[in-house]
Regions:
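Activation corresponds to long, low-complexity, non-globular regions
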Residues: 2-185
């Protein structure tokens, strides 16, 4: 598995600025249909072409982050994480007008830097059928799920935000904002 791919170009005139999200929204999006590509190409979901049921049979079960604003979970690079389930989408908004004006002849590019983990629902992944145990900074990635998770200050955030149950073969969901029941059938 790849941990990181990076390509850097040395450009001494480039200035790097940092923006924090001004708002967050975790919500249901659906499952992107896969693009028609060659058999040796990776599966590439299309964000615009959405279906309500997943193309796979098993979803890791456990407590996922509830829908709505999740600002406290991404406010710091700590052990507080947004637990995004399959079909979910996290929208981040930024105030780009807070950056300095672009000098003439220059252009601005944005790069989203994230810190997180991805867990596959794979029989070859330890505890691949469950959301928990949650990962943490400094864990032994090769032993994840075998060593106990230490207590962290961010555990209170998980108690507050991870209140949405997702499970295997779970095609029903609850619309958090309206409280009305929706089904993917």
């Amino acid at each position: 598995h790849w941990d990181r791919i990076a390509l850097f170009q040395n450009n001494r005139s480039a200035e790097v600025g940092t923006l924090r999200p001004t708002s967050t929204d975790l919500h249901w999006h659906g499952y992107g249909e896969f693009a028609a590509m060659g058999p040796s190409d990776p599966l590439t979901p299309l964000h615009e072409n959405v279906q309500q049921r997943p193309p796979w049979r098993i979803t890791p079960s456990g407590w996922a982050t509830r829908y709505g604003a999740v600002d406290p979970l991404i406010a710091a690079e700590d052990n507080g994480v947004v637990t995004v389930a399959a079909g979910d989408e996290l929208t981040l908004s930024f105030a780009a007008d807070a950056l300095p004006k672009i000098p003439s002849g220059h252009q601005r590019r944005f790069f989203l830097w994230t810190v997180g983990w991805n867990k596959d629902a794979d029989y070859h992944v330890a505890a691949g059928d469950r959301i928990e145990p949650l990962p943490w900074h400094g864990m032994d990635d090769a032993r994840h799920g075998q060593e106990p998770r230490p207590a962290f200050a961010s555990d209170a955030l998980h108690q507050r935000f991870n209140t949405r149950w997702v499970g295997p073969l779970n095609y029903e969901r609850v619309e958090a904002k309206r409280g009305e029941k929706k089904t993917g059938r």
